[in-house]
Amino acid sequence: MKSKYIFFAVSLFAALSTNAQETYENAKLAGEDLNGTARYVGMGGAMEALGADISTIGSNPAGIGLFRHSNVSLSAGLLMQSDGKEFSNGKKTNLSFDQIGGVYTTRTGQKSFLNFGFNYHKSKNFDYILNAAGSLNGSSQNKQSYIKGILGDENSGGFFVRKDNNGKNVGYVDATPPLPSTPPKVAYTWSQIDDLYWNSLIPGSTGTYNYEKATGYTLDRAHTGYIGNYDFAVSGNLNDRVYLGLTFGMKDVNYKGYSEYRENFNNAGGVLVRDERKVTGSGFDITAGVIVRPVAESPFRIGAYVKSPTWYDLTTSNVTRLVYVSGTTSPEKGIGNSYDFKMWTPWKFGFSLGHTIGNNIALGATYEYENYANINSRVNNGGYYDYYYDQYYESSIPDKNMNAHTKEVLKGVSTLKLGVEYKPVSNVALRMGYNYVGAKYANDGQKDPGLASLGTTYSSTTDYTNWGEINRFTLGVGYQVKKFNIDLAYQYSAQKGSFAPFSNVKDITYTSGTTKITESNIASNTDVKNNRSQLLLTLGYRF
């Protein structure tokens, strides 16, 4: 973003009827962990040119063409978080079933094969506990909602608050009620968290609108769930020189997050917001790849591949509760909702090199690029029914507002993967790998609570984290006994981030009576970490 503050008063984006998820929530679903077989993980995943491992089915399916024998494998292990404290149902150590798959080989010529593969692997493990705390110096989450009410105009990031027919405060587009024949229109900038504050804390006991200043905050959030990939591939080789592969992939999304956000007020009271959110759904993508041995007498290989966007069809739902405490406990205020949306991830491109020395050394290197600024949030805007096939097809259009915000906050990411395998004896392999994954978030990016989008309307939290680059270090060992193999891998992943409880708003001026008042709501960022280790075991059989 061009500035670290959001200036609501100059209108970030024009209002538009939209229905899509918020940028930071979408970013959680994009990208992949390093996971698969223990051999693949032990070599840092740098096998897109070396091939002959089932885990390449999802990156460069041409690698499936290097199998000479049919093979099945199964992988599971432990995922361990180094930092933080356990919270709710979040645990720092979790069992994980990570992979099962196989390859069936068929010979089509003296040096040519046509191979078929299937593999399930957990491409993203959400198990992670986030703990954050910091000072606020008079700013607060409820002040953000209060300022939006001051701004009024939806195009300026605000809303006009008045009572509905049930006596509840609602943020509307119009400053005055429309004609009785015209239903009032709720502003897209009116979020679920705004609804909670404007119907509890901001009116107070007297009904006079005001906000509470806070001295500090704490947040605890337990992320759980996964994205599971189901990949089906066909791959073949031409005279053991050119290998081609194509994968059709399906994805299963199961994410759950539960958080408790607390603020301590200057008046010795405080607020607690409990939020539970789920994201479920499915998606599919297509991957194509090629591996070439440019010199017939050399094992040196060059690989290239491209992965289409993952076309997701998702449902997000939440239940959020607010407890306002000012000397005594007040009744909880609750709100919840659910809606469907679509999201398309960016294209991914990869280039890889592989080489073997004799029968005991293998070297691999892979470079990948994926531009997360091109995440496409989609609006479900209707559909049509195909009576011939007895199917309903839902249509969608881009959420222009949210996609523009995504381009401000997210960016292109380069990934470098390096790996080596050494066999001191023919049936024992030692492996080592390294990954560098660039940061997908802009350093000064932040949520935009004034965005006219249903991604804002259904938002139930205000915090966000700008995560930095990832460094992964891997080790592995493999042992072969006749047709059986057992492999073990260890992975350490380190990532730092900058957490903020809400977005910064600076220098909003309004008139109260004859007095001009200028408000700002600034939150200091807090450093957080996502450091975790993985132990992974693979059992395989060749036939």
Residue ranges with predicted function:
Residues 1-25, 539, 543:
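Bacterial Sec-dependent N-terminal signal peptides
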Residues 38, 50-59, 64-137, 225-228:
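Outer-membrane beta-barrel translocator/receptor signature
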Residues 21-35, 40, 105-543:
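Outer-membrane beta-barrel porins/channels
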